[in-house]
């Protein structure tokens, strides 16, 4: 019995120690405590067992509360604790009673005279007590351990199940984590590749461009090779065709039975080669000749181009001067309209008359009602500017002409006004109408006589000059190429001076005779002076004024002589007595002479009073003679005009005509040489024939005065003709 209980206890202890180490520790402690204190072993063991169970329940509850959903140990421990409490409450008084009994038994005094109890009996008694106690304890433990073991096994199974679930979940999570890591690595690799591709993009593009360049170079090389091969193929094809042709020709020759012998063929071949060489030499010579001709023609063309350019520049400058002169003419017309009051009144009276013939107004006929002052002024300006352009321009650079003398291109103005002249019949009708009007007009005051004389004289001269417009226009047309082509020939002035010196010696004595003749006429007029008024004195005061003329030659400056220029008094009358001439150079004063008083005829007095008179009487007046002297170069230009019925004489001597003839011949020779040099001998012959005809006609006509000084506005005149040589224009007179 004891052994069984011990074995049971040992087994229970072993089971409890396996599953619950805390209980094993508690039991070991209890056993040790029981051995130490065997008297109080039962109580202590019970109390310790109960405490151990309670502690186990607490620890088990604390351990399993986190893992298990259903905690069976709590119910089990609660029941166990209630039973244990009840047992302890029931066993406490029993234990206390036993202890008291033992204590009382130990304290009871043994009788002194009694014998002690033997030890064997004491041991037997103790063993019986211990066995009884063990039995009770074993019973109690059987029920408790059975319950505890069942609950613990159930709990262990549940925990194992949960552990297996947790292991499965852990394995699944580990597998999933592994897959996620692999996926992350793949993603990282892809991202790295993308970033690297972005960073290496310029390198990739550069590589691509290099590849493209290389491919293009290869393509170009391949194309060049293909072209070369195709070229070679074409060449070979051509050679093949040529060889085939040669082969066919040779076959035909070999098949030809009428072929000559070899010697004859060689002779023919040598002849043909010699001919070919000769032809080649001829071709080379012709090519050389062609090159030489081209060079010569190119040089000639360059010369002609230079000439044409010079002519164009000359024409442009002349046109500019013409425009300036036209502007000056307009200004002079305005001045005349303002100052010539008497002429305006005459025009108004002419407009009021009904019997005045209605004729179309022109710019060059002074009988026109509206353009009388302007036309006279234009002819006056042409008289002032009849010197060629290239002469005046060269002299202007040397400083021997005043700055106001700009009359250089009137050669272009001449055809402009001459082309608009009316016919002879119209001029005659106008002349007759004007005579009738003048006869019917009342006599004006004496102070207006000079102006009327000038107007009527200019009108008569213009009526006669209108009949010869054709010859004058031809002369001006022949003069234009000379004016345009003389500009680039300034270096030849020395030759021109020699030509000037080559003028016949008859000119000088004739000039002296003409001057003596003029002096004689002036003295005769002084003897006939008697009834002239203050107007006559003022009108003829300019006849005594002498102007120093400078004869300027290229390379020398010498004063050669002086000439008289009458007619300056009209300019002083028009612009006022106190106004000095504009073109007088500073430092060159006038040679003052005492005034001469003249007497006039009845015709001149009638003209002073505004009455009409015959043309002979008018022309014999000193005013008309002065007009003739101032417009001498204009009259020399008009020497070529054909004779007409109206020929006023101004007393020009034979010396003046001889001098004009000499100048005309010199000019004609110079002109013919220039024309022959420029345009050939044929053109020069035609020009010479036309000039000779004009000169042959010129002696038949009397000297014609120009209408340019009709209103007395000229301040400086040129003492040479426009038909003279270019060096003749070097002689100038300054007022």
From Swiss-Prot:
Region of interest (Disordered), residue spans: 12-54, 91-115, 356-379, 473-597, 632-657, 685-735
Coiled coil ranges: 205-335
Biased composition (Polar residues): 689-707
Compositionally biased tracts (Low complexity): 43-53, 528-541
Compositional bias of kind Basic and acidic residues: 487-525, 542-553, 573-588, 632-641
One family name in Pfam for this protein: Lebercilin
Entry keyword set: Coiled coil
PANTHER family registered for this protein in UniProt: C21ORF13-RELATED (PTHR16650), LEBERCILIN-LIKE PROTEIN (PTHR16650:SF9)
Recorded family membership: Belongs to the LCA5 family.
Name recorded for this polypeptide: Lebercilin-like protein
Taxonomy of the source species: Eukaryota, Metazoa, Chordata, Craniata, Vertebrata
Gene from which the chain derives: Lca5l
